[in-house]
């Protein structure tokens, strides 16, 4: 048996062990492998990264080499393309396809290539001759091709490094961005330039080429560049060689002590502002698209250079390289062209021997000297301009008019005649002047050219010029001199390279192809441009400015001091612009235009006129200080007057009138500021204290409408109200209440034009308003905790709104409906008054209550609607009964709250918490009210509705009548034993005496809560009792609150009953309101008899509503009868009547009328109802009948007065109501004794009567308890109409079932835990809630 097991164990155990060990080993190995991989991964990734970096570097290097080769091949491609076309032009046609710039390397290279192709020679130029040969080559080519040499040098960003042409063209090593410095620089190098930094110009046409980024001197001296050249005149070569050798001897810095006649810089000097003479044929069929593209880029950049000149950074670098820049001058007629150097004793003249400075100065007397730097150029005066127009210029291209020929500027003495042969080119080609036709250029030059001279002695310190011009147009003296001579930068303020300190703060516009220096130049150019376009400059103004400028210049040889130069700047003008900046963005132009306008206003116009006037008003003449507008020091700030605008033709002229302006001293501004601050502080302090000036208070009154008037501001003293009424007094605006300090009055007098204004402050609320607000918040909080609908607590603030009405408004009111906005805090008519008109209708007027209900329905759920109410419902605060009005307001609010509770429902928890909270204090107030009720008559109740804690005691006469009624009821009870037909009326009479004794005095106080609990068809709505009825048209129960039967017959009796009801439960009626009711009371009296033909059972039902709260606490649990029929068979009309009058206070009877009515009712009840004997035959019915009579005895007399007979249904309803109160009476007997122990002797007598009447009812109660299950089931299964009508006459058995049903019902109601009492008016609950009194 065990052998297989052991075998398996012996075999499996080792396998298990070894297998586990193997698995563990595998796991360990896997973990180690993973760890190793993780540790080695960074090393491998690092190696890969290094490899990628190295590979990327190699790729970048190869890419750079490839690109450099491509760039170097571009000129070769250009040449190859030209060669492939098979084009062999004539010598004079070579430059037709190229620009006229003699120093453009690309064009020169192309021209040389073409020249060599034509000649077939390949010559290499040595290093010493490369520079001059280049210049000579350019000059020769231009002379043979009739092209002008008055062009500037510019280089392009797309220039190649190491431009290697064919054997004819030497390598142009690193040609990009080279600048023209001096002819000796031609020996040097075209050093490295910034690849993407497009070339800038020769400073007004000097052909000295220097790279943007310069190499060291050694590199410059040792660099070799082979320059192309054409066959040159040997004479020119020999004349230029000495200067080149001189420039190369031991010069680490490139100096300019050489003659530039071969390059004719003077010619370029004066021509640069107007001369970019590009002669292009109309059609270039031999050029390929690529060549055309390159040429187009070249031309565009050259034009841009011509417009904007050399960037500031390039000029600064050149200044470092050339410490002694040359000077140029415009020669007179037939005078030699010289190149003058500052601080240099010798001047080398081309083709002439060296002469001294004095000799040169004598030769050039009266001629302007031009500086080397573009930023320091000056313009010509009118005379010199006229003189220059008469000077022939053979080297320049013949232009359509002598004006443009004069613009060609200085000219050389040699080779001039050779260029005359090229004048025929002007007939074939158009000359482009900065992209404009020649005619346009001519007109601009002839019209606007003007200039200004400069000192001509080299030792004279040359102040920076204040009125330079833009490169593509002439200019007048500058408009905005922004720097002083002492602090001027090397470049002129208005030069393209100059930027004022304020300009650095301007918004930088992102123009992709412009550098910072270019943008700065553009910005200033646009400043000039905007002025010229917007305002223009008439010829008369220009001539006057030119004359002024001419008078400011001195002849040659006389030094001009810096002061004189500074004084000469007073004549200010702007430059004339000639073309639009098509490449400039529109948004940039707009921004610049705005900036220009702002700058003009700030620099030329000063502060706005209004500000100046306001400052002057604050100061006297002695406190003003006149400051010269010409001063720019910070201590002497000047504010020039606005520039006058004069219209001359179609142009607006800016006449800069620099008149002295008065400006306040700083300490005066400080004083004014301190005065204003102190004034504001004092005002704020007074306002915080609640003291408002009369003018401010009056403005508040004006802003508040009369309908919504508010109580006077409490902080204004009564003695000052007279000032508030003097609105017509003009001085009242500036008056201040006596509590204001005197200094403030003086301050206001010092500033008569000012009116003190204060921000709106929250008005101080009265104590009553604060209390109402607090109450509103509490109600909202309770509504939130109890889960009430929003409409409930939304309506509460309206109910809390005070009836604040000024007496003036009250006197103006007319007896007509008034629309009142439903605002939460301020209302003319309080919401409580609206509740009165919508509340109980004691007259029994179904239609009137229904109409009012219809008006009220939209007002409750809809917030902010207009509610139209009759004027009768408004509360008059001027009523003499102030206490009555206050009480009435509270009761109306409570009534309104109860209406809302009935309509929308209150949760059970809210009711329980309310009962527990109010039970103890209300018990005390109720007991006090019971004592007071015994000593006061019914007349006071009719005059004014009084709250429960101040209800007066009933009249002793009424007590006597009640006792008499009790005796009569006892007699009736004895007669009932003898005859069953008379038993019920007698028992009812006896019941009246029994119940009226303990609680007859409390009828007025507890009637409202009975009315509230009368809804039969809504057993779930179990709200606490309150001093108000249900709101009309909200409950659909036809038998909710029936009307009194007495209101249906006699109008006189109706009025009497209405008076009783107003005294009992109409708490919302004030004395003033009762005086206005006669007209309204007459209407329901005539209508009720037709509306309620059958009202006996409704009368008994309404009496049941009035009864429970009037009597002992035993009645309250049976206030609500879920099993009451909604309709009675055979009484459809009465059902409709019940629907119309379900929320009215129908049963409100005075104690004085009870005995009289009881005496008249009893015989009618016994005579007119023969069928009543059947229900009363049963033994247990006797006690119950007595209970029913007790319930209905109080109200039955009134019904008997109105209607002589009782119907069958009314009697059965009385029995039903009696059965509802049997069980609580027996249980709460002890409570009844304790509650009425504090009453007067009359109350004790009533207790004895009640005890006697309750004795026969004990046995029925016990029997009803034993039959609870069957009675309850029958009560639940029976229809509601069986309780009333002919079906109730079946026999004693059915009556017994009914009795059992009613005896069972109180227990079920109490089991449900729904309270049936009003803590405010029903003393039962207050006593029951005390310790030792279980509920």
From Swiss-Prot:
Instruction: Spell out the residue ranges making up region: Disordered.
Output: 403-424, 480-502, 972-1002, 1019-1141, 1248-1335
Location in or out of the cell: Membrane
Chief localisation class: membrane
Superkingdom of the source species? Eukaryota
Basic and acidic residues bias: start-end ranges: 1047-1064, 1071-1083, 1129-1139
- What keywords does the record list, in alphabetical order? Membrane, Transmembrane, Transmembrane helix
Q: From start to end residue, where is composition biased (Polar residues)?
A: 414-424, 972-1000
The transmembrane residues are 8-28
Question: How is this protein situated with respect to the membrane?
Answer: Single-pass membrane protein
Which terms in the GO cellular component ontology are assigned?
membrane; nucleus
Q: List the disulfide bonds.
A: none
Tell me the protein family, please.
Belongs to the SPATA31 family.
User: Protein name, please?
Assistant: Protein SPATA31F1
**What organism is this sequence from?**
Homo sapiens
């Amino acid at each position: 048996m065990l052998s297989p097991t052991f075998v398996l164990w012996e075999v499996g155990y080792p396998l298990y062990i070894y297998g586990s060990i193997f698995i563990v080993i595998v796991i360990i190995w896997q973990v180690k492998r993973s760890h190793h991989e993780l540790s080695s991964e960074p090393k491998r990734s690092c190696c890969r990264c290094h490899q990628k970096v190295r590979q990327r570097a190699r790729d970048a290097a190869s890419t750079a080499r490839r690109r450099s080769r491509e760039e170097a091949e571009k000129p070769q491609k250009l040449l190859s393309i030209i060669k492939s076309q098979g084009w062999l032009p004539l010598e004079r046609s070579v430059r037709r396809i190229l620009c006229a710039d003699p120093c453009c390397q690309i064009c020169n290279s192309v021209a040389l290539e073409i020249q060599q192709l034509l000649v077939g020679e390949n010559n290499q130029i040595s290093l010493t001759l490369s520079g001059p040969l280049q210049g000579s080559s350019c000059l020769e080519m231009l002379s043979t091709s009739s092209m002008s040499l008055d062009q500037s040098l510019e280089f392009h960003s797309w220039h190649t490094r190491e431009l290697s042409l064919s054997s004819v063209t030497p390598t142009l090593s690193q040609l990009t961005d080279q600048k023209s410095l001096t002819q000796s620089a031609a020996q040097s190098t075209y050093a490295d330039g910034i690849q993407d930094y497009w070339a800038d110009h020769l400073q007004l046409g000097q052909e000295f080429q220097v790279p943007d980024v310069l190499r060291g001197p050694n590199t410059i001296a040792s660099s070799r560049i082979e320059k192309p050249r054409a066959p040159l005149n040997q004479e020119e070569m020999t004349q230029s060689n000495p200067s080149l050798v001189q420039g190369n001897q031991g010069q680490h810095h490139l100096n300019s002590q050489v003659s530039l006649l071969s390059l004719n810089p003077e010619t370029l000097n004066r021509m640069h502002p107007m001369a970019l003479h590009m002669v292009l044929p109309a059609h270039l069929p031999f050029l390929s698209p690529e060549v055309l593209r390159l040429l187009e880029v070249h031309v565009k950049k050259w034009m841009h250079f011509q417009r904007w000149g050399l960037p500031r950074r390039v000029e600064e670098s050149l200044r470092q390289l050339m410490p002694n820049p040359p000077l140029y001058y415009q020669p007179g007629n037939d005078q030699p062209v010289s190149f003058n150097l500052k601080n240099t004793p010798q001047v080398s003249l081309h083709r002439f021997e060296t002469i001294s400075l004095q000799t040169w100065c004598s030769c050039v007397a009266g001629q302007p000297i031009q500086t080397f730097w573009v930023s320091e150029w000056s313009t010509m005066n009118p005379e010199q301009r006229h003189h220059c127009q008469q000077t022939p210029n053979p080297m320049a291209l013949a232009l359509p008019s002598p004006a443009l020929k004069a613009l060609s500027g200085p000219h050389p003495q040699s080779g001039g005649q050779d260029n005359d042969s090229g004048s025929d080119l002007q007939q074939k080609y158009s000359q482009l002047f900065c992209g404009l036709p020649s005619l346009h250029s001519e007109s601009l030059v002839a019209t606007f050219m003007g200039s200004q001279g400069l000192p001509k002695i080299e030792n004279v310190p040359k102040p920076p010029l204040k009125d330079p011009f833009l490169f593509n147009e002439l200019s007048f003296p500058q408009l905005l001199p922004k720097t002083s001579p002492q602090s001027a930068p090397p470049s002129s303020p208005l030069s393209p390279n100059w930027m004022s300190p304020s300009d650095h703060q301007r918004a930088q516009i992102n123009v992709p192809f412009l550098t910072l220096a270019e943008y700065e130049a553009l910005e200033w150019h646009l400043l000039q441009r905007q002025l010229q376009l917007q305002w223009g400059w008439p010829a008369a103004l220009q001539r006057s400015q030119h004359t002024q400028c001419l008078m400011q210049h001195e002849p040659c040889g006389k030094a001009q001091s810096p002061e004189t130069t500074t004084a000469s700047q007073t004549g200010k003008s702007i430059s004339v612009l000639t073309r639009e900046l098509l490449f400039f963005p529109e948004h940039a132009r707009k921004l610049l235009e705005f900036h220009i306008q702002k700058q003009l206003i700030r620099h030329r116009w000063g502060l706005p006129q209004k500000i100046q006037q306001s400052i002057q008003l604050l100061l006297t003449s002695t406190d003003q200080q006149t400051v010269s507008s010409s001063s720019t020091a910070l201590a002497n700030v000047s504010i020039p007057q606005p520039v006058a605008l004069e219209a001359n033709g179609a142009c607006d002229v800016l006449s800069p009138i620099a008149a002295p302006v008065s400006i306040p001293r700083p300490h005066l501004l400080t004083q004014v500021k301190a005065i204003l601050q102190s004034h504001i502080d004092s005002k704020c302090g007074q306002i915080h204290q609640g003291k408002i000036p009369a003018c401010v208070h009056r403005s508040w009154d004006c802003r508040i409408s009369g309908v919504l008037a508010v109580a006077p501001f409490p902080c204004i003293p009564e003695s000052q109200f007279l000032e508030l009424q003097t609105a017509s007094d003009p001085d009242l605006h500036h008056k201040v209440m006596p509590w204001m300090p005197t200094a403030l009055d003086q301050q206001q007098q010092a500033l008569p034009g000012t009116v003190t204004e204060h921000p709106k402050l929250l008005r101080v609320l009265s104590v009553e308003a604060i209390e109402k607000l607090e109450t509103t918040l509490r109600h909202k909080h309770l509504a939130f905790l109890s889960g009430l609908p929003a409409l409930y607590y939304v309506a509460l603030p309206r109910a809390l709104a005070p009836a604040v009405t000024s007496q003036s408004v009250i006197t103006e009111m007319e007896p007509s409906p008034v629309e009142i906005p439903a605002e939460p805090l301020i209302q003319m008519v309080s919401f409580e008054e609206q509740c009165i008109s919508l509340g109980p209708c004691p007259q029994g007027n179904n239609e009137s209550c229904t109409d009012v209900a219809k008006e009220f329905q939209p007002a409750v759920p809809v917030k902010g609607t207009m509610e139209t109410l009759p004027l009768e419902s408004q509360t008059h605060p001027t009523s003499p009964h102030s206490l009555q009005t206050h009480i009435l307001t509270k009761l109306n609010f409570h009534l309104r709250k109860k209406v809302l509770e009935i309509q929308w429902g209150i949760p059970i928890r809210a009711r329980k918490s309310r009962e527990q909270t109010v039970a103890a204090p209300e018990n005390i107030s109720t007991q006090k009210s019971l004592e007071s009720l015994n000593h006061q008559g019914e007349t006071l109740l009719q005059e004014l509705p009084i709250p429960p804690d101040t209800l007066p005691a009933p009249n002793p006469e009424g007590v006597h009548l009640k006792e008499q009624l009790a005796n009569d009821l006892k007699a009736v009870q004895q007669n009932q034993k003898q005859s069953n037909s008379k038993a019920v009326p007698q028992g009812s009479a006896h019941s009246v005496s029994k119940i009226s004794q303990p609680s007859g005095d409390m009828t007025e106080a507890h009637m409202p809560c009975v009315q509230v609990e009368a809804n039969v068809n809504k057993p779930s709505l179990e709200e606490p009792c309150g001093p108000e009825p249900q709101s009309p048209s909200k409950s659909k129960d036809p038998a909710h609150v029936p009307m009194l039967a007495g209101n249906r017959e006699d109008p006189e009796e109706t009025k009497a009953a209405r008076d009783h009801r107003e005294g009992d439960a109409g708490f919302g009626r004030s004395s003033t309101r009762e005086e206005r009711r006669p007209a309204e009371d007459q209407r329901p009296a005539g209508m009720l008899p037709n509306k309620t033909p059958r009202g006996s059972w409704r009368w008994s039902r309404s009496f049941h509503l009035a009864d429970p709260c009037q009597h002992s606490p035993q009645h309250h649990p049976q206030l609500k009868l879920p099993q009451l029929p909604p309709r009675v068979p055979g009484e459809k009309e009465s059902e409709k009547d019940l629907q119309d009058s379900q929320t009215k206070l129908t049963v409100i009877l005075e104690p004085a009328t009870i005995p009289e009515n009881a005496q008249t009712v009893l015989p009618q009840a016994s005579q007119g109802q023969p069928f009543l004997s059947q229900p009363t035959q049963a033994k247990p019915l006797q006690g119950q009948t007595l209970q029913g009579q007790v319930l209905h005895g109080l109200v039955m007399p009134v019904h008997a007065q109105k209607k002589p007979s009782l119907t069958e249904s009314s009697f059965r309803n009385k029995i039903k109501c009696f059965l509802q109160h049997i069980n609580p009476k027996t249980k709460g007997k002890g409570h009844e004794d304790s509650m009425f122990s504090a009453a007067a002797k009359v109350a004790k007598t009533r207790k004895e009567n009640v005890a006697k009447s309750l004795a026969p009812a004990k046995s029925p109660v016990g029997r009803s308890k034993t039959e609870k299950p069957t009675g309850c089931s029958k009560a639940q299964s029976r229809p509601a109409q069986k309780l009333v009508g002919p079906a109730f006459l079946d026999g004693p058995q059915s009556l017994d079932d009914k009795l059992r049903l009613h005896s069972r019902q109180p227990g079920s109601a109490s089991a449900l835990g729904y309270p049936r009492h009003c803590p405010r008016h029903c003393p039962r609950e207050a006593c029951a809630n005390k310790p030792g009194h279980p509920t």
